[in-house]
Amino acid sequence: MVQMMRRATIADVAGAAGVSKTAVSFAFNRPDRLAPETASRIRTVAETLGYRPHPVARMLTQGRTRTIGILTPQALSVIFENPYFGAFNAGVATAAEASGYALHFISPLHGSLARAVNRATVDGVVAVGLSAHHAEVEQISVAGLPMVLVDSTALPSQAAIEVDDEGGARLAAEHLLSLGHRRFVVLAIEPSDRSDGDDPDGVPARRLRGYRAALDAAGIDLPREGVLTSVSTIPGGAAAFAETWDAGQRPTAVLAMSDAIAVGALRAARERGLAVPGDLSVVGFDDVELARIADPALTTIHQPIARKGEQAVELLLAILEGRSGPDQHEVLATRLVVRASTGPAPDAARRTH
């Protein structure tokens, strides 16, 4: 019978290197407590013996889990369905892996986000789409965990990463106005129970302000019935556009607060025999891969989603390591990307659908 090779222990390394077990521990966890040449020699001996420090032991020694929590108000099944979060999480993962950190997604546990937060063992948190006044955010602050808010309303004392939502929305509306459109519908992001959707400074509110600012400047009123909410998915966008069109509204332009909603509107328009952009123009927001492969390719507002995820993690690590204060606030630029889903407003003869 083949006998399994015994795993090297900290005592084996200490004996081979001629040092104490404490010195071996310092070499991996507190190298500043040893002379550089001693720490290097111990690590070389450990590598030769195939010794690896136990991760739990390292956590206890360092007081760190080397894990970052990603706090989201929606269930993971919803998060992973949304292409925006795919791009954002890719950026988060890139920055975390580069610094040797793991990720822990914190989403509602048995319907309770507070319970999930309470059970999370992490060094710091990136909170997405939650305002500073939400109970879970306050819970993290009280616990003293470093935190970066993303796409959220932050207090002056809190670190935050966001994009210029209002400016981007204004660009979208101005683009359609320049093409002669005068009849608009806005397909807004529907808030979850815990998101910042009802926050007057949350992402949906900022984007709506941007749309309204451009329309107001052009003398165009956007009535209450001209704003419908939708889950940020393709089916959600399709249902929202179908509702407005089937109710008798006849917009020539759709301002959608996400690319997924916009692509849903394209689908519903096609099902109703509308040509895009001949009869209807559609602008999204995000510029995810879905926008580029849509038919027709989607005009949208680009935001650096992956980079936003990277910067959120980089800022959190800087706070953890004392290289940045906890109150840094960064706003990333947005820009218009014109593709095939927008065109001149149809003339009066064609506005008879």
Per-segment meaning from a language model:
Residues 1-8, 55, 67-174, 178, ...:
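Alpha-helical recognition/docking segments in bacterial nutrient-uptake
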Residues 1-67, 348-353:
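N-terminal helix-turn-helix DNA-binding module of bacterial transcription factors
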Residues 23, 62-77, 124, 175, ...:
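Short beta-strand segments enriched in small/hydrophobic residues
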Residues 74-87, 106-113, 161-171, 187-240, ...:
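Hinge/beta->alpha junction and helix N-cap segments in small-molecule ligand-binding domains
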Residues 123-128, 185-188, 227, 248-258, ...:
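Periplasmic-binding protein-like
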Residues 182-183, 222-226, 276-281:
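Short acidic capping loops at alpha-helix termini that bridge into adjacent secondary structure
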Residues 238-353:
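Flexible loop/turn connectors
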